[in-house]
Amino acid sequence: MRKFFLFIAFIVSVVNASGAKLVEGSLDCIKGEKNIAVSLDCSKLVYKKNRPFQEFLDKASRMENWEEESLKYFFKKFNEETFKSHFSAVPVTSRNKGKYEMVITPLKINGGGDIKVHAYIFNKETNEKVATIEFKTDGDDNDEITLRDPMKEAGEDLGSLFKKLLK
């Protein structure tokens, strides 16, 4: 019986370790907002220890618009998580009237496609960073939509975090 409880504790700790964590700032400013504009910035992304991200891209055939396609998976999963909170993630456009923007910034991708990511929340009027969220995602290295699986997982993890923090 004791082994069973240790196993359950291990599973719970693994699940909690993989989720998104607010590491700086607060999301209190988001309360009352209807949406947040989201963009993907891969400019800081490195492959393995310090190789250019392009080496990862060159491992398989990729769609030309893989960033845009990857974000579609993020929006779907994030919005499924936050639907009951009446809050949604939307693409960055000039028509977006929301006050805040989230920039998803992948930092490091390993050989199998797993990614370490920061998501930064900015006040669009002042350009002030109000929060930093950190998480890791599983992935693969040969998907035509390069970050499809990581963006699905990011959508779920960040959506779940926002849902909890918006209560």
Residues of each region from the PLM?
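C-terminal/domain-edge helix-coil "capping" segments
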Residues: 18-28, 125, 129-167
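Mid-chain, structured segments of secreted extracytoplasmic proteins
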Residues: 65-94
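Sec-dependent N-terminal signal peptides
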Residues: 4-13
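A structural "domain/chain start" motif
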Residues: 16-72, 164-167
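Surface-exposed short loop/turn segments
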Residues: 85-145
